[in-house]
């Protein structure tokens, strides 16, 4: 049994609500979002999502819809998900301030609607610091990263300097590469010729957890 378009849309709504606010939407909120007259239709669609292994519901608990972790969802269930739902690992933290170590992983996977990002990201990183504040990127945000080594001057990139990673505005001139903050309280990073420098990916959107 495959998911209908409306069931895929409800799954996306639940996913985005949990990732943004930390809790699932209520059945009344789902009904309102889709123009249902009451929660009975919502309950039917939630029954299907639970049967297909996409969610689980905590009995007698308000906002008790839970997404099943990726490792709990079998391959058949994954195949039934909408192509517009991205399954993205959170690989760790990236500095919007001073570079931080690149070996920090969270070990999480989240489901997100593709519409939040352009181009489609390959993974998420959690921002630490506020050097990109004027680009609307704040401490604690999850940023989508499109994995590529190709970038142009003026793009926001995730870059590796030696064994550290950072998110900055890339500025390439004839004789130097700079990583520019978007906050006047921070100084640009000049990439030296003796440093191991690489572009890890392009910034392609963000998710802001409720806090």
From Swiss-Prot:
EC annotation from Swiss-Prot or TrEMBL: 3.4.21.88
Disulfide bonding pattern of the chain: none
SUBUNIT field: Homodimer.
Site (Cleavage): 96-97
Active site residues of this protein: 131, 168
DNA-binding feature ranges: 27-47
One term of GO molecular function: serine-type endopeptidase activity
Gene: lexA
Keywords from the named record: Autocatalytic cleavage, DNA damage, DNA repair, DNA replication, DNA-binding, Hydrolase, Repressor, SOS response, Transcription, Transcription regulation
Protein name: LexA repressor
Reactions performed catalytically: Hydrolysis of Ala-|-Gly bond in repressor LexA
The organism's taxonomic lineage, starting at the top: Bacteria, Pseudomonadati, Pseudomonadota, Gammaproteobacteria, Lysobacterales
């Amino acid at each position: 049994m495959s998911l209908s378009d409306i069931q895929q849309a409800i799954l996306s709504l639940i996913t985005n609500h949990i990732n943004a606010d930390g809790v699932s939407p209520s059945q009344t909120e789902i009904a309102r979002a889709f123009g249902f007259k009451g929660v009975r239709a919502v309950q039917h669609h939630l029954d299907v999502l639970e049967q297909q292994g996409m969610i689980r519901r905590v009995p007698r608990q308000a906002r008790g819809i839970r997404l099943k972790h990726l490792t709990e969802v079998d391959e058949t269930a994954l195949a039934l998900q909408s192509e517009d739902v991205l399954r993205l690992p959170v690989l760790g933290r990236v500095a919007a301030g001073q570079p931080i170590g690149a070996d920090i992983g969270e070990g999480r996977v989240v489901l997100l609607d593709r519409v939040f990002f352009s181009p489609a990201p390959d993974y998420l990183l959690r921002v630490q610091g506020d050097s990109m504040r004027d680009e609307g990127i704040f401490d604690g945000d999850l940023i989508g990263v499109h994995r590529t080594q190709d970038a142009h001057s003026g793009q926001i990139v995730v870059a590796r300097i030696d064994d550290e990673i950072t998110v900055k505005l890339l500025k390439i001139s004839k004789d130097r590469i700079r990583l520019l903050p978007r906050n006047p309280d921070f100084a640009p990073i000049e990439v030296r010729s003796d440093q191991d420098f690489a572009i890890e990916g392009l910034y392609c959107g963000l998710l802001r957890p409720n806090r």
